[in-house]
Every structure is written in C-alpha cells, then in structure tokens.
C-alpha cells in the first residue's frame, strides 16, 4: 500500500489539473468605470489617431492586456495617408466636433497609427481562434479655441467598448479555454474603419482560422435588462451561439432589423468583408430611442465624457455576455469549426 500511495497521489493530481476551472467572477460596473475614467480623461486628449494622446492610450491598453495575462502583446503599426480634398458642403451642417474632426482629417497628411493586439493561448488548440475587439481612437481636440471644453473624450464611443474588452480578457485568461483568443484594440476607426482593415490585411494568424469575432462599440447607453440585438451577416452560424448564450444569462432576444443601418459603421464590417464571421451583440442596439438620444446629444462632441450618471448597467451585462460568448466559441465541444457566410445584412 505504501508503494501505491505515491502513484495514487500522482493520479489524483492529474485528475485535479484536468478539471475545468471554475467560472470567473462576473465583471462589475466599477471595473468598467475605472478603465473608462482613464481612457476618457483629458490627459489622453481625445485619443485622435496619430497623436500623442492616441500613443498614450495604445501603451495603456497594451499594459492592461499584459496584466490580464495575454501573451504576444504588440502594436501593429499601419500608415494612414490622407490626400487633402475639398470638404463636401454638407459638412457645414455637421455638429461642431465632427466638422472640426473632418477639417483635421483633411489637413493631416500621412501618419502612423497602431492597433494593440494580444493573445490568450488555448490549452487544446485546433487551428481555430476567436477575436474580441473594440476601437480605442476618438476625435481628439474637437471644439474651437473659444470653447471651455475642447476635448472629445469619447467615454461612450468607445472607451466603454475597450473597457469591456480588457475585462473580458482578464476573465478569459483564467478559464483555460481550448482555443486561442485574440484581443484587438483598433486605431483609426473614426477615419473609416482603417485599423480593422489593417488588421484584416496583415493579421497575426490566417483569417480562415478565425471562426468567431465579436466587436464592442458604444455599449454604455442602455440600462440593464435590455434584450440582446445582433448586428451580423445574414445567415451567420453564430446566431444560434449568441441566442443560447443570451438565454443562459436570462436575457431576451430582439430579432427585428431596427439597427441594421449601423452594420457598415463599425469595425466588424471591415472584417466581415474579408469573410470573417463577425458580430456585434448587446443591448445598446436594442434600445434605439436611447441610442438615438445619445447620438443627438453627446456623440462626437465634448459632452461624451464620463459622469456619475453615465449608464453602465447594460454595459456590464454586455461585457459578461461576451465572457460567455467567448467561453462557448473557444470550446471545441460547444462550437465545432465551420465556415463563414459572408452575406451582407442582419438577423
């Protein structure tokens, strides 16, 4: 018996290490608020692509990815070259922040922007991977010199999405999932989804290996308890995955097409055009009344800053939804490999 005891202990240890890790603690509102407060602070000067504020944001996100447990964290540099053109007459009718941003775009010329990329390695990789992304750039200094507050801080658009991606990465790194999960914070989204296009043009892995991609954008709008709406290509095989994940968390489904007009205005669109199965899921695009109120009052203006009454209830629910989405997508049992269905539209 004494001789068998060491072997028995070794076998028991092996069984213990093979057990799946316990579910991670849920993401809390305070976590998102803390990260948003940093990225949307005046010290980052609105995170306009190609500026010191943007570089500072990229360094901060890279450090947060590393601290979360991601490996292979790097900055993916890409060139942005804008040839000056005459601004359309309609630009005069745009909100001041957006108009000044267009004027700055028109005179900037060439500069270098940076995506932030990191990976949480899978424990049983099968040549397939998951991508979770959000853009971190915004409009920078967007108001005239005579204005008291000149900085477009971009708290909702899109420090909220980046905060969620970081929080998801922190959970995923503890879960021991089968497949690799890549976390991407894109730059120059406001310039025409350029960071997402750069990632698709020079990805750290073959695009065909990506079987599920999730984009988070402008999530701090809706309160908790909102149904889950999904922006995606028609016929995407991910719909059943999202429905199941939402149902497991007690959330209802919003299957109408009210938010279809936003499909081409977010980074997932640029990647979907390259055949990647990309979705954007959550409550913000289920409550168009609240979303349109934000777009009319604070979007692309100095008013988009973190306040004590900034709505983060729905953002927390959406962040936790994405932990569950990644858990399912990165499981070889729960989500077998499949091909993308790159048709334009929404379900």
Please give the residue ranges for each predicted region.
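Second-shell loop/turn segments in exported
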Residues: 20-26, 42-52, 101-107, 146-158, ...
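His/Asp/Glu-rich mid-to-C-terminal helical/loop segments that flank catalytic regions of hydrolases
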Residues: 170, 174, 289-347
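Metal-dependent peptidase/peptidase-like ectodomains
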Residues: 125, 177, 186-290
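Alpha-helical metal-binding/catalytic segments enriched in His/Glu/Asp
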Residues: 116-118, 128-192, 322
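Extracytoplasmic/secreted proteins, especially bacterial periplasmic and envelope-associated proteins
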Residues: 27, 31-34, 38, 52-64, ...
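Structural recognition of the beta-strand scaffold that forms the well-ordered cores
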Residues: 37-40, 74, 117-119, 129-133, ...
């Amino acid at each position: 018996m004494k001789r068998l005891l060491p072997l028995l202990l070794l076998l028991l240890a092996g069984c213990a290490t093979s057990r799946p890790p316990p579910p991670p603690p849920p993401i809390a509102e305070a976590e998102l608020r803390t990260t948003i407060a940093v990225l949307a602070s005046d010290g980052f000067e609105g995170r306009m692509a190609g500026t010191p504020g943007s570089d500072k944001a990229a360094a901060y996100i890279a450090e947060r990815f590393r601290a979360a447990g991601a490996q292979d964290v790097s900055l993916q540099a890409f060139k942005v070259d804008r040839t000056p053109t005459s601004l359309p007459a309609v630009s005069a009718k745009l909100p001041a922040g957006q108009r000044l941003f267009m004027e700055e775009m028109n005179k900037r010329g060439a500069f270098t922007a940076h995506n932030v990329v990191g990976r949480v390695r899978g424990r049983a990789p099968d040549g397939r991977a998951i991508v979770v992304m959000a853009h971190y750039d915004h409009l920078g200094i967007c108001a005239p010199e005579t204005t008291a507050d000149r900085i477009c801080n971009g708290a909702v658009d899109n420090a909220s999405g980046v905060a969620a991606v970081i929080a998801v990465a922190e959970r995923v790194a503890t879960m021991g999932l089968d497949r690799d999960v890549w976390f991407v914070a894109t730059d120059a989204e406001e310039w025409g989804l350029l960071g997402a296009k750069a990632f698709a043009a020079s990805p750290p892995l073959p695009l065909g290996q990506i079987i599920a991609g999730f984009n988070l954008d402008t999530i701090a709008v809706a309160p908790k308890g909102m149904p889950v709406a999904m922006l995606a290509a028609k016929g995407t095989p991910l719909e059943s995955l999202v429905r199941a994940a939402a149902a497991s968390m007690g959330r209802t489904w919003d299957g109408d097409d009210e938010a279809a007009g936003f499909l081409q205005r977010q980074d997932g669109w640029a990647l979907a055009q390259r055949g990647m199965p990309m979705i954007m899921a959550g409550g913000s695009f289920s409550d168009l009344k609240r979303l349109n109120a934000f777009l009319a009052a604070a979007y692309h203006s100095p008013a988009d800053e973190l306040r004590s009454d900034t709505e983060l209830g729905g953002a927390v629910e959406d962040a936790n939804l994405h932990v569950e989405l990644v858990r399912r997508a990165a499981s070889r049992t729960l989500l077998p490999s499949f091909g993308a269905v790159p048709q334009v539209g929404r379900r």
